[in-house]
Structures are given as structure tokens and as C-alpha cells.
UniProtKB/Swiss-Prot annotation:
The organism of origin for this protein: Ostreid herpesvirus 1 (isolate France)
Protein name: Uncharacterized protein ORF10
Superkingdom, natural source: Viruses
Amino acid sequence: MQSYTELVKLTEALMGARTSGIVKSSEHNCKICRSVIPLDDKNKIISILMAIKENVQLEMPEDIADVKLLDFLLFWKGKIEYSTVINELFNAHKGYFHHCYMVDIIAKRYARKLYKPESLEENKEWLALATKAGFMADSFFRKNNLYDLLHELTGKDVRPMIADDNLEKLTNMSASSESEIINNLIPMQLPQILALFEQILQKGAPKVVIEADGCVKVNHCIFETKTADNKVLIKIGMPIEYEHYNSFQSSYYGNGICRGSKHKMNVNVGRIYRAVKAVAPQVTFNFYSMKEETCQEVCGCVEKQCEIAKCAVEGIPFIPKELRAIPISKITRRGSMDMDIM
């Protein structure tokens, strides 16, 4: 038995669909919607709801006696489930599915409420109707892990979908420290991502690119996949100043950390590079993303990380500037100059 509150919600959705711009402006609105009770008349809807609530018998107008949409509302008086309601809605529009935007809106809006995991067999009938009518998108089945049911209803090969969804789950993983990046994120998640990439694209092992990203939190690391380029990006948050303001989204691009900031860069990109190299032989470092550009300012520690990464790629030890030997050509020969003057 559904509550009166749920009836009001569903009826409001009907009214919203009936009065929405796409329905009102459409020339393909089905004849059933044109002959049904005026769902855009709020007062009449309320009176119908009150009559149902008070168990008052409503008269059925002769001109819509065969439509069943008034019955669709009256069903709420007795024991009724969402699946029965949606079946009635579909049955009333039999033959008009692709001409009725209202049914399309209702079906999509109530897909989540109509589906009940505990009674999948009971729901199969209306799921099949909705899928056949083109109202049920793949995303619904994928988000609810109904791959087998999607295959049964549509005949689609769901294996690539499963692999793609698993890839998305893995790439949502992130790390917030160097130890977490090196000990957890790279050795545990990256091999699974690479295996799924090969399974989905079948183009061989993907390339792994390490790059700096001013939109990722400093000292954090995230994955991003570029299936079109057969590439996996490992983005490390570097201290970079705001690049530009996005007025449409009312947000800044960049993590907003300027040159000389107190935010320390505690991640050694060279060590991360070596950890990735142990898992994925095809790994490169995007040096350009670390360089200072005219459109953004970077902290000095970013430049240092770029040097560390270059040394890691070249296989040579990194020596800080203050400990490096000074080239002879840059030493001022003060003694010889004094002798020349004399």
C-alpha cells in the first residue's frame, strides 16, 4: 500500500511533465495526453486527490473511458505497487511510446523509485517494457549492477561495460601522501587499471604519464584515464597559482598556491617515477607541465621537483644546487685581475 504522500509526489511529477516546455511545445504530443484529464489544472488534480483520500467514488467521463489514466490515479485507493502503476502507464500509451514525452519524463524521473533490489523478478516486467520502449538507459542497469538483466533484455554484450565501470571505480582512488602513493596507490591500483585498459581497448599496454596538476591538492595524487589515447595519467598536486577564473562555474582553475608559499611540496616525484617504472615499463614524465608558464606562477619547490624527476628518468642522483660543485668557468679570478691592474 503506497502512502498518500507518494501519490501527491507522483501526481506533481505528472503535472510537471504535462506543463513542461518540451511537452507543451511539441507537435508530436500523443492523443492520449490530449484527451486525458487536464493535468495542468492544479485545482482539479487536488480535488481528485482529496476524493481518493476520502474514498469518494469518482465518475469516469465517457470520452476517456478507454484511456485508463484516470484508473491509474484511482489505483492508489487499493493495494498497489509502483510496478503496477508503471505498467498501467505503459499500457495506456501502448503504441504511442515514441510520441509521448510525458511518459518519457515520468519513466526516467521515477526509475530509481520503481526499482526494488529485493524484488527483481517482480520488477522484470516493467523493466522490460521500459527498455523496449527506449526509456531505460544503460546507465540505470550499470549503476545498479544489473548487467545480466541488461544482457537478457537487450542482448548486448555487457563484458566491455563491466570492465569500463570497474576501470572508473579504480580511477576514483586517490592518495594524500608520498608513502600512500608509493606503497598503496601505485602497486595495488595501477596494475589493475593497466590490465583493464588492455581488456577494454585491446591495443596493447597503455602508456603511463606522470604530470603536475595545479587543480589537484598539493601532495595528493589521482588517476585519470584517456581511453582514446590509450593513456593513463598520474596527476600529482603541485603548488600552482590560480590560472584563470571560470565565471560560468563560479570557480577558479588551479589550487591557488603562489610562488614562495608556505605550502611545502613533500612528494618526491623521482621516487614516484621509480615506483611506477617497476609496475609499468612504458612510463614518461610530462616535464612541460612542471615548467613555469606565462599564464600561471609556480612555487620554487615545483622547479626543484622537475629537476628531481629529470634525474630519476636519466638514472643519475639528484644533487641540490647548494651542494653542487661550481664550474671553474664561473669562478672569478680576482688574483690575476689584481696583477693585471698593477
